[in-house]
Amino acid sequence: MPKLEMMLLVLLILPLPYFDAAGGQSVHVDGYGDGLARYLQRGERAVKKTCIRSTPGSNWGRCCLTKMCHTLCCARSDCTCVYRSGKGHGCSCTS
């Protein structure tokens, strides 16, 4: 099988919600957050962080291992979430 066909096959098999251009990790959570807790405790991520659901009533949500600012993930935990008129929410990180 040529490489291009193999790559397209792999992309069709992988679920698209796992790819998130805005940063963070999209995870499937159940109504009680157990799925999210399992994700956060996997490997070296034994931390408790908050997640937001993608849409109200959805079982999909986004988890940030640093800090969440509206729907974005900040680069570091010490960043603050700010709102800039005309630009929306963003992270302000101290150097």
Swiss-Prot record:
Keywords: Acetylcholine receptor inhibiting toxin, Disulfide bond, Hydroxylation, Ion channel impairing toxin, Neurotoxin, Postsynaptic neurotoxin, Secreted, Signal, Toxin. GO terms for molecular function: acetylcholine receptor inhibitor activity; ion channel regulator activity; toxin activity. It is found in: Secreted. The homodimer contains 10 disulfide bonds. Disulfide bonds join C64-C73, C69-C81, C74-C91, C79-C93. Residues 25-45 form a propeptide. One of its GO terms (cellular component) is host cell postsynaptic membrane. Expressed by the venom duct. Residues 1-24 form the signal peptide. Its main location: secreted. It comes from the Eukaryota. The modification 4-hydroxyproline is found at P56. Alpha-conotoxins act on postsynaptic membranes, they bind to the nicotinic acetylcholine receptors (nAChR) and thus inhibit them. Through its two C-terminal domains, this homodimeric protein would bind to two nAChR allosteric sites, located outside the nAChR C-loop of the principal binding face and at the adjacent binding interface in a clockwise direction. This toxin slowly and reversibly inhibits the ACh-induced response of the human alpha-7/CHRNA7 nAChR subtype (IC(50)=6.2 uM). Homodimer; disulfide-linked. Negative results: does not affect the human alpha-3-beta-2 subtype (when tested at 6.5 uM). Belongs to the conotoxin D superfamily. The cysteine framework is XX (C-CC-C-CC-C-C-C-C). This is Alpha-conotoxin PiXXA.
